[in-house]
């Protein structure tokens, strides 16, 4: 497997941010022993210095991922990330049409991993989870997934106000508008349609932008990650303007 060259979207003496490819793990995990490529190790080799992750992105999600360039910076900045003193913007393609923007305040129970959390308590209280969402574009495709001859999809902008595990995926599923390509919370019929008709084999969730005040310069940092080839060909097919996600 050829080494991946990560796209660096921001770098200074304190931070480096990359556009994480969909399907790539952030760091080594004993749950995925067969994997050989990880963002942390690849980036370390690429820039020739150690990096320290400040937040996480699920394996199937693409987009902005920020690292500190020293453990001292990481320990100073981690609390800011943990307290959500930054604004994250995601884009997703979801089933159905959403007509109006809104804010979903729907608590989520801790989602335990069958293997990693085998001995964790199953009885934890649901945690507050808040997501602002806004529809940006619609499409109706001439393929059936049920009783109707066509199927509708929507391009969404989402800003999580809290950071629960799989929050955006679970919140959109709760609204009955699951994200396309979500194999754990989504709808298999729509995932299959996108695989077969649009050659889309990934979760259509992308971390487009991250904003926060630089803790050492006090300037506002805006880090952006562009969409990949799968997204671009969907925008072409659906006649959507890529400016919507810039």
UniProtKB/Swiss-Prot annotation:
Keywords: Isomerase, tRNA processing. It holds the Pfam family PseudoU_synth_2. CDD domains: PseudoU_synth_TruC. It catalyses: uridine(65) in tRNA = pseudouridine(65) in tRNA. One of its GO terms (molecular function) is tRNA pseudouridine(65) synthase activity. The keyword Transcription regulation does not apply. Its EC number is 5.4.99.26. The active site is at 58. GO terms for biological process: enzyme-directed rRNA pseudouridine synthesis; tRNA processing. PROSITE patterns: PSI_RLU. It comes from the Bacteria. It is an enzyme of class 5 (isomerase). The keyword RNA-binding does not apply. Belongs to the pseudouridine synthase RluA family. Responsible for synthesis of pseudouridine from uracil-65 in transfer RNAs. This is tRNA pseudouridine synthase C. It comes from Vibrio parahaemolyticus serotype O3:K6 (strain RIMD 2210633). The gene is truC.
């Amino acid at each position: 497997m050829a080494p991946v060259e990560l796209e660096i979207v921001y770098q200074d003496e304190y931070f480096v941010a990359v556009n994480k490819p969909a399907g790539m793990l952030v760091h080594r995990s004993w749950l995925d022993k067969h994997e050989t490529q990880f963002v942390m190790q690849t980036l370390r080799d690429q820039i020739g210095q150690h990096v320290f992750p400040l937040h996480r992105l699920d394996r199937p999600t693409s987009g902005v991922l920020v690292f500190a360039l020293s453990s001292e910076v990481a320990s100073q900045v981690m609390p800011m990330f943990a307290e959500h003193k930054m604004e994250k913007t995601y884009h997703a393609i979801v089933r159905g049409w959403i007509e109006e923007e809104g804010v979903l305040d729907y608590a989520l129970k801790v989602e335990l991993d069958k293997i990693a959390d085998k001995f964790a308590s199953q009885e934890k209280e649901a945690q507050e989870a808040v997501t602002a969402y806004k529809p940006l574009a619609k499409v109706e495709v001439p393929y059936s997934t049920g009783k109707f001859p066509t199927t509708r999809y929507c391009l969404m902008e989402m800003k999580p106000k809290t950071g629960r595990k799989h929050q955006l995926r679970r919140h959109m599923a709760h609204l009955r508008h699951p994200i396309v390509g979500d194999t754990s919370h989504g709808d298999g019929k729509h995932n299959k349609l996108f695989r077969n008709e649009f050659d889309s084999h990934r979760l259509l969730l992308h971390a487009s932008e991250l904003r926060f005040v630089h803790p050492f310069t006090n300037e506002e940092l805006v880090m952006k990650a562009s969409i990949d080839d799968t997204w671009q060909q969907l925008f072409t097919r659906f006649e959507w303007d890529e400016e919507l996600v810039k």
